[in-house]
Amino acid sequence: QTKFRKWKKYYIKSFEYKANKVRFGAYGMVALEGAHITAKQIEATRRTLTRQLKKVGRVWIRIFPHIPVTSKPVEVRMGKGKGAVSHYIAPVKPGTIMFEIDGASDMVSKEALLKAGKKLPVKVGFVDRSKVGDITMNEKFVASLKGTRAARKLAEKKDFGNQKRAFT
């Protein structure tokens, strides 16, 4: 993709089918919903991960904020062109592996990833590379999905129901 100076609005429409596997580390943080994540949120998450792991593990960031978001100055009337670029976002689809960790124990990695996930505007899950397709989701998230459009979409997708294709 070309990095234009100003983009049109970017909408997240589907599930992630490419960046849904843990490729570099042993553990990963997966997005359970779609959202736009800013560069500041990615940096805050990275800092939390490195502080939690201290000097033991290594962190990979799998998302990059490449889409500019524009805004007009305060108290400026409409018209006169598109506003200036205010910040950059990374579009994240459900199922995207956002961060990966290696070199730390299972317990430390899980705790670090779930604690760092609180810095992001999406619900996150923990993926273990050795347990293919296994995701630790909190019960509150699963309960919140029941009867929603997202739950129906998950049920419609045959491969997505057992989470083999989406999160392996």
Where are these regions (language model features)?
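Ribosome-associated RNA-binding proteins
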Residues: 1-168
